């Protein structure tokens, strides 16, 4: 297959599909990666992630340097210019190469007549860069987040919102989960050191290791054999709070892509686990993860609001509900989230979460444990959600995580720590 090698035009098309069409980067990027040589895949990914991370700034610069926006069939050029700005600001690509390749990208998207315009805007930016960046530093766009999300974070975290925003704008660390059925964490860290890499254990999550420097999975000792899995430290907290035991009947609801399903089975290899997700396509990832780790679980497609459709009258000893959410705790890992979410989505998600909680609670045995988890930092989906659930559910009691007035444990994203995550552990009386 002929490889299309103008990365800049491909990156522009990817960002356009995210911002204009509401597609997630995880769906858009893989087919575009197939169009470039292996050596260029990392740069294409960097351009896509980087432009989405700094989109507010790049948009602000375009508005300063162009008298009117590019619209209609020329819209891709708008994003191509952003790709040019991003290279000049944030990459080690030599400026002359960044300019030449970005201008040439106009040919790939069949807009050769706009090469002069692109060249002119990028050169004007180079001339005015210092003045423009000084002005940008005092603008509302400097937070690199949509205004509605900044307001929500300010309201929820009056003293911490800037730290959360700064964390969201950083590159994420790479966390791994050591498969305790194969090695102790210390034992695997020794293998990692033998392979010339360094890792650090997490103080609270017993299987979690942070790599000093992110590495491709094929370089990790025993990855193909299932000795280790890529999973953020905070996501590993779910199994810690769930505390699964061998012989128990356990439901992992909203299970795709299967990271938590397999963690449950590493902690309790003889548990009977049912993994359910509404998205048939994403369930293929659950099967892949189970296969790589040599594990078995019952995998079903189903809507969490209607458990009778996928589990009949079954009841479970433990339930993990990793609820659908705004994903505002994992923005540093998925910067497209900032531009895919809308303010109105939060109330809709909170309503969906409440419906799933109410539907699945009767499926928990008396004395059983339900862990409600999200990768959100917004109280409407987390603390407020559990507070109102406890008020309307007399046989539910909070355990280990917070108080009835301030229920749950909220992890915030930050530095080398895990992602933003919320957990509430509930016991059925």
UniProtKB/Swiss-Prot annotation:
Keywords: Cytoplasm, Methyltransferase, RNA-binding, rRNA processing, S-adenosyl-L-methionine, Transferase. It comes from the Bacteria. Gene3D superfamilies: Helix hairpin bin, NusB-like, Sun protein, domain 3, Vaccinia Virus protein VP39. Residues 400-412 have a biased composition (Polar residues). Residues 397-419 are annotated as: Disordered. The keyword Oxidoreductase does not apply. The active site is at residue 375. Specifically methylates the cytosine at position 967 (m5C967) of 16S rRNA. Belongs to the class I-like SAM-binding methyltransferase superfamily. RsmB/NOP family. This is Ribosomal RNA small subunit methyltransferase B. It comes from Salmonella paratyphi B (strain ATCC BAA-1250 / SPB7).
